[in-house]
Amino acid sequence: MAATAAVPGAAAGRASKRGGGGSGGGGTQGAEEEPPPPLQAVLVADSFNRRFFPISKDQPRVLLPLANVALIDYTLEFLTATGVQETFVFCCWKAAQIKEHLQKSKWCHPTSPNVVRIITSELYRSLGDVLRDVDAKALVRSDFLLIYGDVISNINICRALEEHRLRRKLEKNVSVMTMVFKESSPSHPTRCHEDNVVMAVDSATNRVLHFQKTQGLRRFSFPLSLFQGSGDGVEIRYDLLDCHISICSPQVAQLFTDNFDYQTRDDFVRGILMNEEVLGNQIHLHVTTREYGARVSNLHMYSAVCADVIRRWVYPLTPEVNFTDSTTQSYTHSRHNIYRGPEVSLGHGSVLEENVLLGAGTVIGSNCSITNSVIGPNCHIGDNVVLDQAYLWQGVRVAAGAQIHQSLLCDRAEVKERVKLKPYCVLTSQVVVGPDITLPEGSVISLHPPDAEEDEDDGQFSDDSGADQEKEKVKLKGYNPAEVGLEGQGYLWKAEGVNSKEDEELRQSLWGLMIKTEEESETESEGSVDPEELDSRAGSPQLDDIRVFQNEVLGTLQRGREENISCENLVLEINSLKHAYNISLKEVMQVLTLVVLEFPLQQVDGLLDPNRYCALLLPLLKAWSPVLRNYIKRAADHLEALAAIEDFFLEHETLVTSMAKVLMAFYQLEILAEETILSWFSQRDTTDEGQQLRKNQQLQRFIQWLREAEEESSEDD
């Protein structure tokens, strides 16, 4: 709950701010134009999400090392190079660690041109809370930069700042924010899918007219009014990367205070655009083409940005520059982007192929192959080790014969002999794995038991919340050798059991992918869509289309039954709907399967028991089997249909005893093949609910019957 000392001039800023102050304001009357006030920045040193859990259980995201430099140091170097003279760093999670790091850094040295003031509170839950505190404390006196502490950039912000100030001068403070974006193709590695946006922008003024996140969308809709009466034209932009850098007027903090529903910048942007005609506020865009800016929002972005730093795309923020003035950051740079720190030892026959950073005091054994990797200080690598896109932090030990591919090993993690880490693995601090074990793709191992997270919910933003209790749990709960090896220390994290909407982000892995089975990931959104979820996605065109398509298919089948329409004509109608709503064949198959299974529920008021449900469904399956067979053809289609059937019965638990009869009907009608049913039943990488479903006695008897039938068929052959 600590705060900084009063900021010089803050009281004056509070007195004048409500009058629309800020650079370019109407305060000067007849006097000479004053030079712009010192540039300030608000740096948010918290992400307010758990995307980096369990890594960030040990240290805050802004202190995670990227190319052996803490993320926040890149951000502060960017702000200082931009000309920022005063930066307010707002901390919540692990605030003591951030404060200690900054106080030991050059940023808190008396000679620093950028005065860093640290403000901590356990009450911050969002960007909105931070900006409301900025307003309450009257910290900003003019236009300021708003940025997160995990942004890496070399953008010269001066031009954007001049444009912003000029607009506010000419248009009487109408423009409240200028967002900085970079031109970037949709397929570029540093485009984070979660941050992708499509915008409508005034061609002449760069005023943002429409702003929409595109994650998961296939079609975009724009109000027709955008294109009416715009003499200078409107540009639709999908070639932009969000740098997460915003130039804000002082009114921004006040607007967050006035609108408590604003929690994120996106909330703010949508609110301003929605109320532009009423309040008169506008948001503008500044686009850079050659400079660099990106936010490390997940480990996919961590990997991409780290590679860009090593490949010198963020010059002058390159490893050998040592912009932090640290004695351990003295690197030499050689061909193929090989960086070596002091006192590095490289064994006989070891090859550093390209894009490799070796931290100070690191020892590499003989006959190692290292490429596209970052190794922190004081690491020890044994003989015959392969590192490819590996990110090793401080003090990591890798024993002989290990192979690490596209994975992250945090401080003092240890990999024993002959361990293989497949892509997207994460070992958090002090984890030990091995020997002689292969970690599957996407494995996350931590010394913190996954179930300890439930106990943290009430105090998740406290630096020491639940620490003592968690240590006791570690003592009581042993490690699983099947997961971490005979000498391993750590727990395998899984996210399949997370169901609450508040914790939905925990279903996102550290790498920006989903931690779930392949079948689950391919069918997650194409089935029935919860209306509340639909509302929460702000009218997503893709979800709207799937929902409408599902209703249209239901109507088509109802009409087909009433009017005795042939299956051939039903297929033609469904295909026309498919093209009208731009639905993929996979989505058609999944929606059709669900609609058929749900059809009896739509026709009867009240609950159905399993016997009555089967009595209603089986004649429908027989009648519509040609339609289903038209879409369920390949083995992959069969598995998708089975996943949709599984989802249906997981959602309708009272009908689960009828599942065996339903699958028998699908089998006898030759919609599903016995080998794919057996393959589906034998899947191990499924949810706990899916495993429980497979324990149903009727289902197990049906599977046993199928296996015996398959064996008899094999004997006859």
From Swiss-Prot:
The GO biological-process annotations, alphabetized, read as:
astrocyte development; astrocyte differentiation; cytoplasmic translational initiation; hippocampus development; myelination; oligodendrocyte development; ovarian follicle development; positive regulation of apoptotic process
Which keywords belong to this entry?
Answer: Cytoplasm, Initiation factor, Isopeptide bond, Methylation, Phosphoprotein, Protein biosynthesis, Ubl conjugation
Please give an example of a GO cellular component term from this record: nucleus
Q: What is the name of the protein in this document? A: Translation initiation factor eIF2B subunit epsilon
**Where is the protein situated, by its record's location annotation?**
Cytoplasm, Cytosol
Spell out the family assignment given in the record's similarity comment.
Belongs to the eIF-2B gamma/epsilon subunits family.
Extract one GO molecular function annotation from the record.
guanyl-nucleotide exchange factor activity
Q: The cross-link Glycyl lysine isopeptide (Lys-Gly) (interchain with G-Cter in ubiquitin): at which residues?
A: 57, 99, 137, 213, 501
Activity regulation summary: Activated by the chemical integrated stress response (ISR) inhibitor ISRIB which stimulates guanine nucleotide exchange factor activity for both phosphorylated and unphosphorylated eIF2.
Which ranges are annotated Acidic residues under compositional bias? 452-467, 519-533
Provide the record's note on post-translational modification.
Phosphorylated at Ser-540 by DYRK2; this is required for subsequent phosphorylation by GSK3B. Phosphorylated on serine and threonine residues by GSK3B; phosphorylation inhibits its function. Polyubiquitinated, probably by NEDD4.
- Quaternary data: Component of the translation initiation factor 2B (eIF2B) complex which is a heterodecamer of two sets of five different subunits: alpha, beta, gamma, delta and epsilon. Subunits alpha, beta and delta comprise a regulatory subcomplex and subunits epsilon and gamma comprise a catalytic subcomplex. Within the complex, the hexameric regulatory complex resides at the center, with the two heterodimeric catalytic subcomplexes bound on opposite sides.
Question: Its function?
Answer: Acts as a component of the translation initiation factor 2B (eIF2B) complex, which catalyzes the exchange of GDP for GTP on eukaryotic initiation factor 2 (eIF2) gamma subunit. Its guanine nucleotide exchange factor activity is repressed when bound to eIF2 complex phosphorylated on the alpha subunit, thereby limiting the amount of methionyl-initiator methionine tRNA available to the ribosome and consequently global translation is repressed.
**InterPro entries according to UniProt:** ARM-type_fold, eIF-2B_epsilon_N, eIF2B_epsilon, Nucleotide-diphossugar_trans, Trimer_LpxA-like_sf, W2_domain, W2_eIF2B_epsilon
Where, per the database record, does this protein carry Phosphoserine?
23, 126, 446, 462, 465, 528, 536, 540, 713
Q: Where is the composition biased (Low complexity)?
A: 1-14
Omega-N-methylarginine occurs at which residues? 18
Judging by the UniProt lineage, the source's domain of life is: Eukaryota
